[in-house]
A protein has these predicted regions:
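Membrane helical hairpin/interfacial module
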Residues: 1-55, 59
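Internal alpha-helical transmembrane segments of multi-pass membrane proteins
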Residues: 3, 226-232
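Junctions where cytoplasmic loops transition into the N-terminal start of transmembrane alpha-helices
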Residues: 7-11, 161-164, 233-237
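Conformational gate/switch positions in structured elements
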Residues: 20-21, 27, 170, 216, ...
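Long, contiguous internal "core" modules enriched in hydrophobic/ aromatic residues
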Residues: 44, 54, 59-227, 239
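Final/C-terminal transmembrane alpha-helix of multipass membrane proteins
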Residues: 232-251
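Juxtamembrane boundary at the C-terminal end of a transmembrane helix
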Residues: 246-264
Length: 264
């Protein structure tokens, strides 16, 4: 358990920084990004997301401080002493843990809520996008810990947790598609983009099949000791979570009220 606790906060900071860099490079007016942090608009998902991304950093740094990797301890004795003092105080440990859980959940759900706020895209016009992105994020996170964990008990625990997340994710996908198909003609046509349209192969094969169903079968067999644990299942889950976001974003951009409504 110690290995993952020491590695994950630093890895999270590195991956989050890469994502922040990608967001910055995607901005059209990069010199104006600082304006997001001089105000807070409770009704704006973009404002919430900006502040969540900022607040996650100190929470992760706190988690990193509580479980410093050995190379950092050896190189910086003063930080090691500070970490030891912080770890001896249960209140600080509890605060860091709760902060990471709350901010992690908000970070996972806000992207889906942000997309669902764009009513001009029929595919995104669903209240299930937020929970779907959250559960998908939890699933890929469990898969990542499962992948890097060195302790056998930890691998089994994370595989069981991931199986639960994958089952919920599959249910949410079914409800998401069913909601679109039972709505207006515009929503039905937008659903067809991922069911039998240009994004169907990526969605059905790489997200549902290789990203959820097959890993769920493999990990179910592994936790029941039918087959040995393998890195293939968590890798497929992580890849499936990434492709899910690509499909939702690009298929959503391809869905339009006017274009679909005026189609013959």
């Amino acid at each position: 358990l110690g290995c993952s606790c020491a590695l994950l906060p630093g890895l999270s900071i590195a991956l989050l920084s890469l994502g922040m860099l990608a967001l910055f490079l995607d901005l059209e007016h990069r010199r104006q990004f600082w304006r997001l942090y001089v105000t807070f608009k409770p009704a704006s998902p973009m404002s919430w997301g900006s502040w969540i991304l900022l607040l996650v950093y100190p929470a992760l740094l706190g988690a990193l401080l509580l479980r410093l990797p050995e190379p950092i301890k050896a190189a910086f004795p003063s930080i090691k002493n500070l970490a030891a003092k912080a770890f001896e105080k249960p209140g600080i440990v509890k605060l860091v843990g709760i902060s990471n859980m709350v901010l992690g959940a908000l970070l996972g759900i806000y992207t889906g809520i942000l997309l669902s706020s764009f009513g001009a895209r029929p595919l995104w016009n669903s209240s299930l996008l937020g929970p779907l992105f959250l559960v998908s994020g939890l699933s890929t996170a469990a898969a990542l810990v499962h992948l890097i964990a060195g302790d056998p008990y930890e691998r089994v625990l994370l595989a069981k947790a991931d199986n639960g997340f994958l089952s919920i994710e599959l249910l949410l996908l079914v409800l998401f598609v069913t909601g679109l198909l039972s709505s207006t003609a515009v929503h039905i046509e937008s659903a067809r983009l991922i069911l039998d349209g240009p994004y169907a192969p990526a969605f059905l094969v790489f997200v549902v099949g290789l990203g959820i169903v097959i890993p769920l079968i493999i990990q179910s067999l592994a936790v029941n000791h039918r087959i040995p644990h393998t890195a293939a299942a968590p890798i497929m889950v992580i890849a499936g979570g990434f492709i899910l976001r690509l499909v939702i974003v690009y298929a959503g951009q391809a869905s339009h009220w006017i274009r679909i409504a005026s189609a013959p």
